[in-house]
Amino acid sequence: MAADTTSGVEHTDDGRHIVVDGRMWRATDPLIPEGRRAELVSILMAWRREVRRTHGARASRDGVQAAKVALGERGTPWWEQSEDERRARWETPVESPES
């Protein structure tokens, strides 16, 4: 396994997963432009706060799901998609809570 020198996060050799406390999680799609990635991460974190605030309301959990799909962390694995499919996924609008 290789460490990402920019974030300190350990990745599997194929780059498809990160390793946190010995557990593998799907990595964010590396083709997402940095600005859009930052926007999606911000939306994801807002939805996570909303999950806590609403004690896990379905709409809040659905918001987390939508953001994670857009980031490539859930849904069809990004390495199985064409570049056009990947671009369409991250360009799909993802609402913020209370927007």
Residue ranges and their predicted role:
Residues 2-99:
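Extended, charge-rich alpha-helical interface modules
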